[in-house]
């Protein structure tokens, strides 16, 4: 399948890696623009950009999503589906609808619980015993689209957000 991938942090790399390993045609990878890091303020690539480049994938880093330029690019890339995992920005409705099969999201909670930002942190802070990932169609409202599938996993009482993030990234890629 011809897929446009959108993601930025480490959490998203597992999903992109799985799509590549499964033999999907990745027509492009959208990730956040490079950001200054440390004292020298040298620009740092996102983890998704690093992985995508290592696989020879074409990377795009739009600074604006609502001026028509990104939509025009997506239409040129002609994906059948967009897969989003922690991209870091709310996507306009026209971008969500551009692919023939729409856009799906890998969300790091069992929706509808913890819609929005930082769901892993909330699960740990609230002492939840169980969390998981949800794969859903994207809609205009944040994390409110129809659910395609979900997978749950226990949270170890001593588990921190970073360890849980890594586990959920892999679970999301498998789901």
Task: List each language-model region with its residue ranges.
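N-terminal Rossmann-like dinucleotide-binding module
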Residues: 1-40
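Donor/substrate-binding cores of folate-linked one-carbon enzymes
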Residues: 22, 32, 81-175
């Amino acid at each position: 399948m011809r897929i446009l991938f959108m993601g930025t942090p480490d959490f998203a790399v597992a999903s992109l890696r799985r799509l590549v390993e499964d033999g999907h045609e990745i027509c492009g990878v959208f990730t956040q623009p490079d950001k200054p890091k440390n004292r020298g303020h040298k620009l740092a690539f996102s983890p998704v950009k690093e992985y995508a480049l290592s696989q020879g994938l074409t990377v795009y880093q739009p600074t604006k999503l609502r001026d028509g330029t990104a939509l025009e690019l997506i239409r040129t890339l002609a994906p059948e589906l967009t897969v989003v995992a922690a991209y870091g920005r709310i996507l306009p409705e026209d971008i969500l609808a551009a692919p023939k099969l729409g856009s799906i999201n890998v969300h790091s909670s069992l929706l509808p619980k913890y819609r929005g930002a930082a769901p892993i942190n909330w699960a740990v802070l609230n002492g939840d015993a169980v969390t998981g990932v949800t794969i859903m169609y994207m809609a205009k409202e944040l994390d409110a689209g129809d659910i395609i599938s979900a997978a749950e996993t226990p949270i170890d009482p001593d588990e921190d957000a970073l360890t849980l993030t890594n586990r959920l990234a892999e679970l999301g890629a498998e789901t």
